[in-house]
């Protein structure tokens, strides 16, 4: 196992492995908000997100969704296929919440009849601005065909995840996806899917089971992430 660091983000580190085209992802215990302006560490968070992501990516693979995920190799680590990350954050929204409530002047909790798919330019220096297809083409982030592939994949992932979270008695409010190109140019789902990247509300109590408990100081982050993992394990057993 090599310790050559390839990339370090807010919540993960990527390392080279002895196998070409395969990277080792190490999940960190750090939690950030406001694009990294606020930062704290929570013991066990990395382990929780690693396990949750591994279970969800495996579930998506069974549903025919291709991703970079290979397998978990420890409590906090997993192996992934090396991809070139497309600098787009793809946000799928099923219920009004967060920035969308402010932008549209709507109340949080209002259901959206048909899921909204949004693109954000993945650039910390610009605070990840909301962009449209024309911006994507102008910035040469992706082609028209690639955007179609990404948008279709995002909607398919949403359909599959809603079934899963409904079984967990959780409403999938919205979530962020990232995609990458493999060595052959195929577009694969990448990054992670966890309470760091999703808004999750308990269907009955409306309790927030995601990073909003940290953003808004309304609960214990590791407690709610543990609750999500436990429910996920229950429905997959």
Curated annotation (Swiss-Prot):
Keywords: ATP-binding, Ligase, Nucleotide-binding, Purine biosynthesis. Its EC number is 6.3.2.6. Pathway: Purine metabolism; IMP biosynthesis via de novo pathway; 5-amino-1-(5-phospho-D-ribosyl)imidazole-4-carboxamide from 5-amino-1-(5-phospho-D-ribosyl)imidazole-4-carboxylate: step 1/2. It is an enzyme of class 6 (ligase). PROSITE patterns: SAICAR_SYNTHETASE_1 (PS01057), SAICAR_SYNTHETASE_2 (PS01058). It comes from the Bacteria. Belongs to the SAICAR synthetase family. PANTHER family: MULTIFUNCTIONAL PROTEIN ADE2 (PTHR43599), SI:DKEY-6E2.2 (PTHR43599:SF3). This is Phosphoribosylaminoimidazole-succinocarboxamide synthase. It comes from Listeria welshimeri serovar 6b (strain ATCC 35897 / DSM 20650 / CCUG 15529 / CIP 8149 / NCTC 11857 / SLCC 5334 / V8).
């Amino acid at each position: 196992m090599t310790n050559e660091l390839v990339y370090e983000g807010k919540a993960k580190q990527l390392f080279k492995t002895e196998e070409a085209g395969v990277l080792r992802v190490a999940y960190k215990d750090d939690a950030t908000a406001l694009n990294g302006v606020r930062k704290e560490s929570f013991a066990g968070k990395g382990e929780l997100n690693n396990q949750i992501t591994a279970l969800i990516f495996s579930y998506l693979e069974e549903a025919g969704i291709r991703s970079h995920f290979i397998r978990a190799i420890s409590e906090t680590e997993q192996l992934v296929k090396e991809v070139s990350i497309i600098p787009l954050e793809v946000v799928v929204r099923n219920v009004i919440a967060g920035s969308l409530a402010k932008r549209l002047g709507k109340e949080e909790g209002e259901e959206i009849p048909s899921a909204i798919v949004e693109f954000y330019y993945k650039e910390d220096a610009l605070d990840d601005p909301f962009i449209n297809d024309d911006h994507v083409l102008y910035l040469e982030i992706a082609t028209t065909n690639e955007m179609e592939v990404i948008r279709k994949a995002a909607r398919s992932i949403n359909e599959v995840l809603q079934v899963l979270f409904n079984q967990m008695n959780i409403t999938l409010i919205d979530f962020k996806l990232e995609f990458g190109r493999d060595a052959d140019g195929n577009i694969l789902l990448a990054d992670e899917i966890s309470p760091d990247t999703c808004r999750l509300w308990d269907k009955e109590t409306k309790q927030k089971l995601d990073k909003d408990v940290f953003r808004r100081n309304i609960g214990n982050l590791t407690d709610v992430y543990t609750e999500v993992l436990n429910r996920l394990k229950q429905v997959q057993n």
